[in-house]
């Protein structure tokens, strides 16, 4: 019972922070998600270099470089940041990180560089794409809908999978996930999309019901793939959770793994499908 209460309290605090970031303006969004990016980088580095810790210097560069790239991705909204193009900042980071590795004689260069670049590619880059979604007209409501869909997908997958899950979805990577759970998550997500499009069109005014349902299907599928991708990394590292930051939930990557795959997929859906 105590574990359930801790897990519930942690989940509510996390959801509250994400809602504050999404609904309380760009400065709140930038501040909260910058911290999330930094924590995600640190966890990914730890997962990918489990047997060989990176140096403090390279870890600091990875975290600062990732936060800088994320913040600069909002440069078109914040004129003070527009003097530096995030593309050039990213190129500068890649060069600096590679040069730093030349002077680290004690560690495996391939493993260390792979961990750093993987953290940038799998954590920072998808989070940076949030700027493309959030800063569009009414983009914050689209992002809010995506978050609702992710949470409903997780809830549906857990409830249905726990009750009637029999057929393994991807046993090699995540033995507990089932096809029944997947379809349950998809059903919950589609129901949420229908409710949003039917009963809250004044607030969620970007799309009609059909397009919201299409978005829900995209979110459900890529949310599952994102979860599986992080499970693959954790299984390779031989750990159950990405960290211990969130009591009852694991690490920050355990909470945002779905979002990291959903954001790029949603942008493709919005820009090229509808």
Residue ranges and their predicted role:
Residues 189-190, 255, 262, 271:
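Hydrophobic transmembrane alpha-helices of multi-pass small-molecule transporters
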Residues 267-274:
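Juxtamembrane boundary at the C-terminal end of a transmembrane helix
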Residues 162-163, 233-238, 260, 265:
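Re-entrant/interfacial helical elements at transmembrane boundaries that shape
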Residues 152-162, 223-235:
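Short helical (or helix-break) motifs at transmembrane helix termini and adjacent helical loops
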Residues 1-218:
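Membrane-embedded alpha-helical bundles of polytopic integral membrane proteins
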Residues 235-258:
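Interfacial loop-to-transmembrane junctions
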Residues 43, 154, 227, 254-257:
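Acidic active-site catalytic centers that drive phospho-/nucleotidyl reactions
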Residues 220-225, 252-260:
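Hydrophobic transmembrane alpha-helical segments of multi-pass transport and channel proteins
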């Amino acid at each position: 019972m105590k574990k359930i209460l801790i897990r519930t309290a942690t989940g509510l605090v996390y959801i509250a922070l994400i809602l504050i970031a999404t609904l309380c303006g760009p400065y709140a969004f930038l501040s909260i998600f910058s911290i999330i990016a930094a924590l995600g980088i640190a966890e990914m580095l730890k997962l990918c270099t489990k047997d060989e810790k990176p140096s403090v210097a390279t870890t600091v560069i990875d975290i600062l470089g990732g936060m800088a790239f994320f913040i600069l991705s909002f440069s078109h909204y914040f004129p003070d940041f527009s003097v530096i193009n995030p593309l050039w900042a990213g190129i500068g980071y890649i060069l600096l990180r590679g040069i730093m590795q030349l002077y680290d004689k004690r560690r495996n260069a391939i493993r260390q560089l792979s961990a750093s670049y993987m953290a940038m590619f799998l954590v920072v880059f998808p989070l940076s794409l949030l700027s493309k979604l959030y800063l569009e007209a009414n983009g914050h409501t689209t992002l809010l809908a995506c978050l609702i869909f992710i949470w409903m997908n997780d809830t549906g997958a857990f409830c249905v999978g726990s009750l009637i899950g029999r057929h393994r979805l991807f046993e090699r990577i995540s033995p507990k996930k089932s096809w029944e759970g997947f379809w349950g998550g998809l059903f919950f997500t589609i129901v949420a999309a229908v409710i949003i499009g039917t009963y809250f069109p004044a607030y969620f005014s970007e799309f009609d019901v059909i397009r919201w349902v299409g978005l829900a299907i995209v979110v459900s599928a890529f949310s599952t793939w994102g979860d599986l991708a992080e499970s693959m990394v954790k299984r390779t590292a031989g750990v159950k959770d990405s960290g211990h930051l969130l009591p009852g939930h694991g690490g920050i990557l355990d909470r945002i793994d779905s979002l990291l795959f959903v954001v790029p997929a949603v942008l493709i859906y919005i820009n090229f499908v509808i």
